[in-house]
Amino acid sequence: LKPSDVYETGKARFPVQTVIRPKTEQYHDFRGYAGKLSGNNIKVGDAVTVLPSLTESIVTNIHFFDQQFDEATAGSSITLELENDINVTRGDMIVKSSELPKIEKDINTTICWMDSKKLVPGAKYFVQHNTNRVLAKIDSVKNIIETDFSGTKEASQLAINEIGEVNIKL
């Protein structure tokens, strides 16, 4: 399938998998955010934004086990420390402030339907991104993509194993 022209690659994305708050005297004020960095590198000093709150901060430290680094590369499992104590929880996304994603409530996407019950407009489903889950409504089914790549055909629903373009409202 041809990737959508709004598909983003090469931008730093850090989904927070856990918040690290050691309960020891030595690290009584430590607050770190652990996860796996994707898309691009992140450096100490980078301005970052936490989604969905849009809270801003600066990366002060990057940890990997007991080592500190000035920069982390995409694919690295790391812990980030931020300049100020802000509310960051599991499932939040930390991104470079200069690389904010486009935030939408109305999404056009391609899906492969895997349920024996047909997907129809008006139906409600949960959509999950990382660990965050929201209720979404199928606004419309635009078409079915032929599996032999011969084209598309208009459709108003998707049956099991059909690939189609749909509009989803979050």
Task: Spell out what each predicted region is.
Residues 22-170:
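C-terminal effector/interaction modules appended to NTPase cores
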Residues 1-27:
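P-loop NTPase catalytic nucleotide-binding module
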